Regions:
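Short beta-edge/loop segments at beta->alpha junctions of small alpha/beta modules
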Residues: 2-85
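Short coil/turn segments at secondary-structure boundaries
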Residues: 28, 114, 170-171
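Amphipathic alpha-helical interface surfaces
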Residues: 40, 97-98, 151
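Short gly/ser-rich loop at a beta-strand->alpha-helix junction or flexible surface loop bordering the NTP-binding
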Residues: 56-59, 92-128, 133
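Short amphipathic alpha-helical segments and their helix-coil junctions
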Residues: 82-84, 133-140
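Positively charged, aromatic-accented nucleic-acid-binding surfaces
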Residues: 84-86, 97-100, 157, 161-165
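Basic nucleic-acid-binding interfaces
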Residues: 89
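Hydrophobic alpha-helical interaction segments
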Residues: 138-205
Length: 205
């Protein structure tokens, strides 16, 4: 039996999805070689309506993984997972900013509706539903992306977000404790990238 063009497109996309495995974030444009633009678009739309894929944002889908241990249904990716997948696809680096950096370190219980990342890639805003979004702000400063330790990067970002004049003793203590978990080689490299007032606080870790 001869396959139609649309059937061939479906088979190619399904095979690639199975190869990536459940729990993967996928981009429709990465499957452009599987068929004509209309065939690829209709295949993704059909997979979404059939429940095979979850649509996270325009052109961005999730090949869902279920929680088999507790039966809690689909394990959805975090905003961080989505942002990192976009950065990886674009071959860009990203740095969490503002309220999200504070949330990551336990300094705030509020999860911002719009999570902000600095990027050395293209600036853009991704709408991910329910009023939430991911905002990528372009930065040409190499310092922002030169950290060896992600934790150290978060600590410095959080301190800069709070500000030298507004940081409390409690916040200072929490951040110093986080910095203690950075290995010495990374710390000695990364501390040089921080503002002078941040260095004075963290150097006593």
């Amino acid at each position: 039996m001869v396959q139609t063009s649309s059937q061939s497109t479906v088979n190619k996309i399904e095979m690639r999805l199975r190869g990536k495995g459940r729990g993967s974030i996928v981009f429709q444009q990465d499957y452009a070689d599987c068929g004509t633009p209309s065939a690829v678009k209709s295949t993704f739309h059909r997979m979404y309506t059939d429940g095979m894929l979850v649509r996270l944002a325009h052109g961005i889908y999730y090949y869902p993984k279920a929680d088999k241990e507790y039966g809690l249904g689909i394990i959805y990716p975090s905003v961080e997972d989505i942002a990192q997948a976009i950065a990886k696809r674009d071959k860009a680096k990203i740095v969490p900013m503002g309220a999200y950096a504070l949330n990551r370190l336990g300094l705030s219980t509020q999860m911002p509706m719009n999570v902000v990342f600095l990027t050395n890639g293209a600036p853009r805003r991704i709408k991910i539903g329910n009023g939430r979004g991911i905002l990528f702000k372009h930065s040409s400063s190499g310092k922002n992306f030169a950290y060896k330790s992600e934790l150290m990067m978060l600590v410095v970002t959080a301190m800069r977000t709070i500000g030298e004049e507004k940081i409390t003793d409690e916040e200072r203590n929490v951040l110093v404790e986080h910095a203690k978990n950075v290995n010495d080689n990374d710390f000695n490299h990364d501390i040089k990238l921080a503002p002078a007032w941040v260095r004075k606080i963290l150097i006593v870790r």
